[in-house]
Design a protein with these regions (language model features):
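Glycine- and acidic
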Residues: 1-5, 141, 195
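N-terminal ordered "arm"
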Residues: 1-52
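A generic structural motif
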Residues: 30-41, 169-176, 191
Length: 272
């Protein structure tokens, strides 16, 4: 069998297509890379075009062998695990060759890194269900987050159910993508070079009121910074209203709106 590096488009369907191609072409993968992430190597590189039919065949096979493995595959692809494609590729190869029995061994060297990464992803999703702060941007609710993992697909149902009568978007600064929702329809789409517009006067007042409320209900004599950081890790503070400086509460635009290349079209919601 030939050793090969595959380049793909970064999508989950594209990754599954890579697995299909590796078996169809009888090639052993040494790396699966997206765009500029291709490592310097002496192995040949082949670009694999996404084929949804081939991807669906691979996924159906995984589900048939083990629904648990299929869930690990989907969630594992959303994690920040270094070289995650190769970890997941090895998981599928082992599943196809040995069956699902190894999934019971939590110390398995193929399984363990993925389990740990998925646990981290699930924890981050849980945290963001409580740590997202939305602002009123001219009739549209807008929020920003800075996750380590791609959490938006897993937060989608929670926020769409919670704000089903609103129009909103939630922007992931780390991965430059956003969740859009309006009138019962939602989509997670790429959104590069986005910058949230400053608040109008009404929104600025509400932000300030929230911060004052947060500061007022605090019991100074019982402050415990270490305990607070345990339950509310500091890396989440950058997008939370109650931890912002003066500039966050200064009105500069009337009304508030979304700004940034591609944003006006995306937030029109007509194409969801």
């Amino acid at each position: 069998m030939t050793e090969m590096i595959y380049e793909y488009d970064g999508s989950f369907e594209g990754f599954l297509t890579c697995i299909f191609e590796s078996y169809a072409q009888k090639e052993v993968l040494t790396a699966i890379s997206c765009g500029e992430d291709i490592p310097f190597t002496l192995f040949p590189v082949r670009t694999v075009l996404t084929d949804r039919d081939h991807a669906a065949r691979v996924y159906r096979k995984v589900v048939k062998l083990s629904p648990e493995a299929a869930d690990l595959l989907r969630r594992g692809f959303l994690t920040c695990l270094p070289d995650r494609e190769m970890h997941l590729y090895r998981l599928v190869v082992k599943l196809l060759e040995e069956g699902p029995r190894f999934l019971r061994d939590l110390s398995d060297e193929t399984l363990y890194p993925i389990l740990r990464a998925v646990r981290h992803l699930n924890g981050e999703v849980h945290q963001y269900k409580g740590f997202v702060r939305f602002s009123d941007l001219g009739g549209v609710l807008g929020g920003e987050i800075e996750p380590k993992n791609r959490v938006l697909p897993l937060l989608r149902r929670h926020f769409c159910d919670r704000y089903r009568n609103e129009r909103f978007f939630l922007y992931d600064r780390t991965h430059q993508e956003a969740l859009f929702y309006a009138e019962g329809r939602s989509a997670v789409r790429p959104l590069e070079h986005f910058q949230m517009a400053p608040p109008d006067e009404a929104e600025a007042r509400y932000r300030l009121l929230w911060k004052r409320f947060y500061d007022t209900i605090a019991i100074r004599e019982r402050e415990n910074p270490r305990c607070r950081m345990t339950h509310m890790p500091k890396r989440y503070w950058g997008t939370m209203t109650e931890f912002q400086g003066e500039a966050h509460f200064r009105a500069r635009g009337t009304p508030a709106a979304v700004s940034g290349p591609g944003a006006p079209t995306a937030v029109s919601y007509t194409h969801l």
